[in-house]
Amino acid sequence: MELLNKSISVVKNVVCNFLFEKIKIDENINIDGIDSGPGMSKRLTTSTNINVVLVLIIALIIFILMLDGV
C-alpha cells in the first residue's frame, strides 16, 4: 500500500511538472513574437507529444508493477 501511494505521488508530480512546463512554453509562444514562427511552434508541439507519450508509458509501467505487487 505504501508503494502504491508513493508511485501515485510520483506520477502526480511528473504530470504536474509536465503541465507546468507546457503552460510556460505556451506563454512564451504568445509573448515572444520572434519565437512564434511556424517552425518553432511545430518543434514545441512535437516535443510535448513525445513528453505525453513518455508520461503515459511511465504511468503504465508503474500500474503494471503495482498489479504484480498485489
UniProtKB/Swiss-Prot annotation:
GO annotations of cellular component type: membrane
Residues annotated as transmembrane: 50-70
Membrane-related topology note: Single-pass membrane protein
Location relative to the cell: Membrane
Swiss-Prot/TrEMBL keywords: Membrane, Transmembrane, Transmembrane helix
Protein name, entry field: Putative uncharacterized protein DDB_G0287263
Organism, scientific name: Dictyostelium discoideum (Social amoeba)
